[in-house]
């Protein structure tokens, strides 16, 4: 026999033999000794203030139970070592119990004392009190509301993730398998639970399994499981299909797709500039492939916008048909979130272009600022040029001040370009030429081997290019002194084809000997300068008109058809060209209240030469336009041969929407104005219209040569794209397009030569340099020639031809002897 005794606490007290009759259980005041299945005829009993658990196990057949000698057991117990240890631990146990009692009573005593000592203390009891909850069965309305609440939460989760329904189906399927298995187990006594669960699963996934059941109740259970299995299968199939469709939709939207590209160009926003930017980037990469400087066969472009992905894909597909050297990817996302640019791999991009998508100038600058701020937390953005189109020079300075980014703001001066091109014939063609990569464009290049060379040697030494100035410390100077020496950090600004730049870069051993400069004595230089000064007309120190070197500009009457927010800039630019007594009337269907804010802005600007008036009417209406022109005709008669100019501008909202609609409106208004003027016999000095699609303008001009269509939006788009390819050119174009900086002018050649002369282009350049101008080409017989080669051959120019120069409106005093 085996006996197991478990001791809990020890305070032994031996019982009398008379008390040993209770064999199954011995009880003391608070302790008990339990004996079970005592063998060998029983055991003598004893009592102690402790707890014993004695277990016995019979190992074989023995005689009936008998008593055990309690005295022998007690003597052995008293002599054992554990007994002595327990006796020694009794005082420690007493101390432990007292300390436990103190710890239990101390917090309550402290609370009572504090509550009694502080009259305003909280008198609440820390002991928990029953909450007295109503445990009655809920009403039907409560159950109904609970179910509705559960369905509501389930639907919310389902909207967030369609996979929630899949999880619910799996839970319901497992529940039916368990319930069906338990029912089969109840009615099938001979099968284990595992087989019953498998039978329920078979009925659920295969509807034919329930036909094999034998009893009635089993058939009912199998039938119910088969019906639910069919429902589960149909819902599971539809859920999986919907989940797949949902994932494919997310992939099509591209909002959460991580772009794994490098050396790609990111374009943010969609407006009328986009097709021209894509065209310019396609042309640049085409020439890069020909010159061998391209790193890939096609340039990857990532188009980002908050418009739906389907619309973006349609645009990309339409553009891809015309452009063979760019590959357009689309991504629909927010342009104000850092996560969007991180997923677009902005830190690995070649350049980032941010286009305006709003009509209001303040919204344009605000959105641009938020997009730039979203780029700031991204690491490694210091070397990535970010080209941002803004509408205000103040925003230009603000974006430039953002640290950690290489921001290159491009001010949208479409209104100024429109005025300049309408005042100077062929100026729009010159801009397009300088922005066409297949022709002569602006280039910036450093020549380490020519450090220390004087600017005059550089200006006259390169015979295949037109040297325009220097780029030093991030600022461009079109008029450096001839004695200025080229520094190591300087870059030379010149006009030349792209292939010439590559050819010169290959000449690593290029030295000063490559530059041929005529060596003249000081006396010869003095004589040449005096001879040239006698053949040119000197500029006044301060010119009051951009269109003429005279003190005052011409007096004209202008009819402006259309309205948008940048009319103020147009009026300011017109004021730089026109003389005193000029007038402008604006005809548009925009109310006077909406124009009043612009009128206040006009009042704040110093307009010296133009008097502005407003008329409300639709420029597309024949009668309204006729009345306006007749009123201008009467003013024209009273003004003693004051020239009349009719200009048409596009609404900004049309440009941001469908550009073709803006072109239709502008072309129709201009054709209608020409028809009315012909019927009334009104002589118009200039008929010009703003247009987006230059191809449409060429078609109409072919039919009506007297009309002029100016694609100012296209010019600004090409500037943005060129800055994206070379961010250093931003300073060049900023100075050229700025009203206060150097601009491109088409001036009469009679200012630079006498009748009967045949000077070379180099000679004309020297004469222009005396007027603090940079000659870049000429117009002969209506045909422009920029960067003519060779430059030393005589030119047969007529007095009505023109010279193309870069000049400033108010510069330093022209050079004199």
Curated annotation (Swiss-Prot):
Q: Which UniProt keywords apply?
A: Membrane, Transmembrane, Transmembrane helix
**Residue intervals passing through the bilayer:** 165-185, 220-240
Report the leader peptide range: none
A Gene Ontology biological process in which this protein takes part is: monoatomic ion transport
Query: SUPFAM superfamilies, per this entry?
Result: Voltage-gated potassium channels (SSF81324)
Q: Where does it mainly reside?
A: membrane
Q: Name one Pfam family in it.
A: Castor_Poll_mid
| The keyword Membrane is assigned to this record | yes
UniProt KW Repeat keyword: no
Residue ranges of domain RCK N-terminal in the record: 262-411, 555-716
Q: What membrane topology is annotated for this entry?
A: Multi-pass membrane protein
- Stored InterPro entries: CASTOR/POLLUX/SYM8-like (IPR044849), CASTOR/POLLUX/SYM8_dom (IPR010420), RCK_N (IPR003148)
GO CC annotation terms, alphabetical: chloroplast; chloroplast envelope; plastid; plastid membrane
Where found, per UniProt? Membrane
User: What family is this?
Assistant: Belongs to the castor/pollux (TC 1.A.1.23) family.
Q: What is the recorded name of this protein?
A: Putative ion channel POLLUX-like 2
Q: Which organism is it from?
A: Arabidopsis thaliana
């Amino acid at each position: 026999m085996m006996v197991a005794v478990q001791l809990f606490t020890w305070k032994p007290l031996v019982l009398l033999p008379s008390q040993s009759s209770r064999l199954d259980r011995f009880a003391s005041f608070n302790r008990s000794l339990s004996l079970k299945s005592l063998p060998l005829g029983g055991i003598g009993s004893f009592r102690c203030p402790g707890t014993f658990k004695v277990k016995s196990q019979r190992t074989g057949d023995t005689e009936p139970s008998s008593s055990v000698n309690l005295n022998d057991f007690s003597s052995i117990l008293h002599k054992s070592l554990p007994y002595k240890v327990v006796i020694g631990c009794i005082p420690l146990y007493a101390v432990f119990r007292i300390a436990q009692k103190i710890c239990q009573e101390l917090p309550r005593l402290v609370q009572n004392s504090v509550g009694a000592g502080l009259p305003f203390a909280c008198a609440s009891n820390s002991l928990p009190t029953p909450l007295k909850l109503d445990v009655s069965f809920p009403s039907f309305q409560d159950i109904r509301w609970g179910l509705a609440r559960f369905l509501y939460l389930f639907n919310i989760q389902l909207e967030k993730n369609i996979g929630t329904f899949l999880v619910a189906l799996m839970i319901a399927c497992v529940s039916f398998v368990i319930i069906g298995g338990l029912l089969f187990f109840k009615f099938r006594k001979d099968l284990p639970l595992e087989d019953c669960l498998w039978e329920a699963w078979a009925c659920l996934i295969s509807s034919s399994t329930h036909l094999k059941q034998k009893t009635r109740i089993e058939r009912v259970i199998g039938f119910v499981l088969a019906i639910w299995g069919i429902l589960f299968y149909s819902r599971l199939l539809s859920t999986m299909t919907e989940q797949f469709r949902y994932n494919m939709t997310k992939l099509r939207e591209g909002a959460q797709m991580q772009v794994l590209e490098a050396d790609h160009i990111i374009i943010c926003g969609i407006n009328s500039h986009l097709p021209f930017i894509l065209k310019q980037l396609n042309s640049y990469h085409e020439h890069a492939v020909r010159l061998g400087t391209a790193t890939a066969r096609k340039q990857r472009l990532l188009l980002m916008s908050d418009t739906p992905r389907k619309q973006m894909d349609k645009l990309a597909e339409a553009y891809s048909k015309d452009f063979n050297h760019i590959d357009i990817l689309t991504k629909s996302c927010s342009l104000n979130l850092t996560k969007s640019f991180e997923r677009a791999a902005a830190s690995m991009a070649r350049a980032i272009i941010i286009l305006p998508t709003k009509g209001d100038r303040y919204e344009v600058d605000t959105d641009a600022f938020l997009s730039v701020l979203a780029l700031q937390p991204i690491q490694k953005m210091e070397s990535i040029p970010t080209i941002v189109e803004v509408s205000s020079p103040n925003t230009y300075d603000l974006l430039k001040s953002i640290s950690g980014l290489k921001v290159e703001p491009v001010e949208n001066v479409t209104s100024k370009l429109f005025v300049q091109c309408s005042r100077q014939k062929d100026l729009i063609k010159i801009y397009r030429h300088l922005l066409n990569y297949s022709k002569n464009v602006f280039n910036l290049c450093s020549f380490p081997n020519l450090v220390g060379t004087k600017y005059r040697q550089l200006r006259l030494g390169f015979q295949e290019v037109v040297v325009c100035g220097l780029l030093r410390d991030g600022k461009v100077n079109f008029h450096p002194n001839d004695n200025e020496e080229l520094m190591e950090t300087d870059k030379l600004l010149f006009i030349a084809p792209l292939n010439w730049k590559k050819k010169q870069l290959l000449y690593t051993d290029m030295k000063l000997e490559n530059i041929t400069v005529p060596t003249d004595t000081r006396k010869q230089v003095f004589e040449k300068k005096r001879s040239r000064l006698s053949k040119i007309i000197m500029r006044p120190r301060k010119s009051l008109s951009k269109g003429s070197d005279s003190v005052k500009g011409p007096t004209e009457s202008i009819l402006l058809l259309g309205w948008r927010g940048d009319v103020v800039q147009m009026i300011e630019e017109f004021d730089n060209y026109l003389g005193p007594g000029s007038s402008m009337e604006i005809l548009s269907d925009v109310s006077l209240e909406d124009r009043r804010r612009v009128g206040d802005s006009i009042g704040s600007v110093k307009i010296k030469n133009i008097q502005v008036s407003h008329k409300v009417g639709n420029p597309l209406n024949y009668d309204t336009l006729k009345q306006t022109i007749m009123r201008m005709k009467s003013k024209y008669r009273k003004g003693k041969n004051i020239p009349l100019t009719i200009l048409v501008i596009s609404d900004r909202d049309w440009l941001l929407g469908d550009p073709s609609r803006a072109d239709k409106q502008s072309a129709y208004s201009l054709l209608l104005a020409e028809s009315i003027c012909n019927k009334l016999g009104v002589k118009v000095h200039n008929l010009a219209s703003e247009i987006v699609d230059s191809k449409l303008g060429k078609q109409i001009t072919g039919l009506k040569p007297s009309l002029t269509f100016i694609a100012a939006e296209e010019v600004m788009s090409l500037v943005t794209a060129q800055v994206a390819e070379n961010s250093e050119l931003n300073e060049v174009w900023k100075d050229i397009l700025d009203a206060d900086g150097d601009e491109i002018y088409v001036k009469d050649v009679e200012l630079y030569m006498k009748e009967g002369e045949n000077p070379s282009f180099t000679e004309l350049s020297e004469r222009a340099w005396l007027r603090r101008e940079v000659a870049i080409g000429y117009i002969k017989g209506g045909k422009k020639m920029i960067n003519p080669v060779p430059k030393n051959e005589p030119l047969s120019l007529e007095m009505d031809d023109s010279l193309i120069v870069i000049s400033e409106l108010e510069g330093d005093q022209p050079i004199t002897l």
